[in-house]
Regions:
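Single conserved hydrophobic/aromatic residue that forms the stacking wall/gate
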Residues: 1-7, 11
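An extended acidic
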Residues: 12-102, 184-192, 247-249, 253-260
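Short acidic-hydrophobic surface loop/beta-edge motif
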Residues: 65-67, 102-107, 167, 229
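Extended, loop-rich substrate-binding clefts of extracytoplasmic carbohydrate-active enzymes
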Residues: 78-121, 202-208
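Acidic/polar, glycine-enriched structural segments that form the non-catalytic walls/loops
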Residues: 123-125, 135-299
């Protein structure tokens, strides 16, 4: 069932030092640690410009996954709060691969779940494919998104202005915490997926790298609810977050497959270097091409 307690703590410390980056070539990006625990205010699953100013905003901070089987729940996420990490889902991680797209494998007893994160080029869209590789019977999977909706250089805290409502759309819901932001469309390709509205603030997420640098590193994040669905062995479901709605959720699978097939594998130093270099070439909405000095500060 993943690592032993001592080994998992060693793995956690090492993994929190390793960060991943994927860009959309338009100034937007996904960046977090390889265990999906944000350690910087610049981290998030969707950080993107929302207008012509080129300023990037953290829209989607994270997505927490919970596996439910035989009446037991196993939260696969990892967050830092004052004095502790909770939940401690890193202990279920058995493998991480970066090519062709960041992929994490979890083992919970006899259940093995694979998560593939795909940031789409030339479109503000994140797709995550979950595949149940092994299981004695069907499992329930819950996906809970956490939102920030703030400038990437700032932090957000619980407030009465944030709109915690979710509006139903085909295949999911749309959310918008503040009226001057675009809608964020959350959809899946699972016909039987249900979104359970449960708006709530979660308090005091800590970003260790910010605190180490002498900056404020505490943030509150809002969740509007969670998706719940059933997965059978060898079945997959794809979660999509985008500032543009997908009219037909059944097309999500094909979109994911097409985008993934276009990714080149990073098999040697040269291919890794080429891949990394392309991350910093940006084409703005007005057609300008730029080379960024670096992510995340100059994105």
């Amino acid at each position: 069932q993943g690592y032993s307690s001592a080994a998992s703590d060693v793995y956690k410390r090492q993994s929190l030092q390793r960060e991943m980056l994927a860009t959309d070539r338009r100034g937007g990006y996904m960046s977090t640690t390889i265990v999906c625990c944000n350690t910087r205010k610049y981290h998030g699953l969707m950080v993107a410009p929302i207008d012509d100013s080129d300023r990037a905003y953290v829209l989607l901070s994270s997505v927490d996954e919970t596996v439910v089987h035989d009446g037991q729940s196993f939260n696969l996420a990892l967050h830092r709060f004052p004095g502790t990490y909770e939940p401690r889902g890193h202990k279920y991680i058995t493998d991480f691969e970066y090519t062709p797209t960041p992929t994490i494998t979890y083992r919970v007893g006899s259940i093995v779940l694979r998560k593939e994160l795909l940031w789409i080029h030339n479109r503000t869209q994140l797709m995550i494919r979950y595949t149940l590789l092994e299981a004695p019977s069907d499992v329930r999977l819950r996906l809970r998104p956490f939102f920030a909706f703030r400038d990437k250089h700032a932090l957000t805290h619980a407030n009465m202005e944030a709109d915690g409502r979710s509006r139903p759309i085909p295949g999911g819901v749309k959310c918008r915490l503040y009226s001057d932001f675009p809608w964020l469309y959350l959809q899946t390709d699972c016909r039987d997926a249900e979104f359970v509205p449960a708006p709530d603030w979660y308090y005091n997420f800590e970003y260790a790298r910010e605190i180490e640098r002498g900056y404020e590193g505490d943030e509150d994040l809002l969740t509007t609810g969670y998706f719940e669905l059933s997965l059978g062995r060898r079945q997959s479901v794809i979660f999509s977050a985008s500032v543009e709605a997908i009219p037909d959720p059944a097309a999500i699978g094909g979109m994911f497959a097409e985008a993934l097939s276009a990714r080149s594998r990073k098999v040697d130093f040269l291919s890794c270097l080429r891949h990394s270099a392309r991350q910093f070439v940006v084409r703005r909405r007005d057609g300008r091409a730029e080379v960024l000095a670096g992510y995340p500060w100059y994105g």
